[in-house]
């Protein structure tokens, strides 16, 4: 295919490329993290909140477009390319799409550096780990999405990780604080009580995010096998995977009830869950 054969990225194609409806539902962990910070700590830093909102949205845009390109490159099934992968059936230039997506990632990382200076250095390592998973989820010789670990990694990063950072940047006293001193002395201060609270309220989002991916992988099992993508349902078998599926959202509900019963989070804050896919 020559350059003249490639289609231009119009706004309708761009919205399809970034999976816009999924981006809107993906904002729920982010908004919940902001809401929980206000509820639990009585404080919202509006500058940090706006910065992280923009950074997280740019990361979400990057992930969608980047994944489409990687899936296009690694695809084995011609029918998948003709009907499912937008890079292929829309005749988009994969290089141009990558340039666009990495521009979003650059914006997100730049904002992240600003947030590190406004909070603490530990955020650099937390955010760096999240970006690592975002890139190598579909990239590399053995992408994470083609392993049975996909659900276990995407859920904690996209679900819990987003809730954690959204709360972290708004806390008056950070639960994790990293500092460097003279003579190569490093101090790491951790408030286990606050971290446990964040873990408890963030786990439902991690579980539900994994549930959505697990359901998608069950539905796409035949197509994934043709593309040599061996996810968790492949190893479990479709029948067993379908049997296990209902327990995932039930586990999320259990953690919600525990949070409400022990007054870690009020039930009203969880209204976001009614709009969360699963």
Regions found by a protein language model. Give the residues of each.
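C-terminal membrane-associated helical module and adjoining short loops/tails
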Residues: 2-7, 190-194, 201-278
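Hydrophobic alpha-helical transmembrane segments
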Residues: 15, 23-27, 49-54, 98-102, ...
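Acidic (Asp/Glu-rich) catalytic motifs at the cytosolic membrane interface
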Residues: 56-83, 208-233
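Multi-pass membrane catalytic core of lipid/isoprenoid biosynthesis enzymes
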Residues: 77-119, 229-265
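Functional transmembrane core segments of multi-pass inner-membrane proteins
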Residues: 154-216, 221
């Amino acid at each position: 295919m020559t350059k003249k054969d490639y289609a231009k990225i119009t706004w309708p194609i761009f919205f399809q490329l970034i999976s816009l409806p999924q981006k809107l539902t993906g904002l729920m962990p982010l908004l919940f993290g902001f809401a929980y910070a206000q509820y639990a700590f009585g404080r919202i830093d509006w500058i940090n909140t706006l910065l992280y909102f923009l950074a997280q949205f740019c990361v979400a845009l990057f992930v969608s477009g980047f994944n489409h390109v990687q899936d296009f490159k690694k695809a084995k099934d011609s029918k998948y390319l003709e009907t499912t992968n937008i890079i292929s059936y829309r005749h988009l230039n994969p290089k141009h799409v990558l340039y666009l997506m990495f521009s979003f990632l650059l914006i997100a990382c730049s904002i992240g550096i600003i947030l590190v200076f406004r909070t603490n250095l530990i955020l650099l390592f937390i955010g760096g780990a999240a970006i690592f998973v975002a890139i190598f989820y579909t990239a590399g010789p053995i992408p994470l999405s083609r392993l049975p670990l996909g659900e276990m990694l995407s859920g904690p990063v996209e679900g819990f990780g987003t809730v954690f950072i959204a709360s972290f940047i708004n806390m008056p006293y950070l639960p994790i604080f990293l500092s460097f001193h003279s003579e190569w002395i490093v101090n790491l201060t951790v408030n286990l009580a606050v971290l446990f609270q964040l873990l408890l309220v963030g786990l439902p989002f991690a579980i539900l995010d994994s549930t959505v991916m697990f359901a998608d992988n069950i539905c796409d099992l035949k197509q994934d096998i043709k593309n040599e993508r061996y996810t968790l349902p492949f190893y479990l078998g479709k029948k067993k995977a379908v049997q296990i599926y209902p327990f995932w959202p039930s586990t999320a509900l259990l953690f919600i009830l525990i949070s409400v019963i022990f007054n870690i989070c009020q039930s009203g804050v969880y209204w976001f869950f009614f709009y969360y896919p699963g």
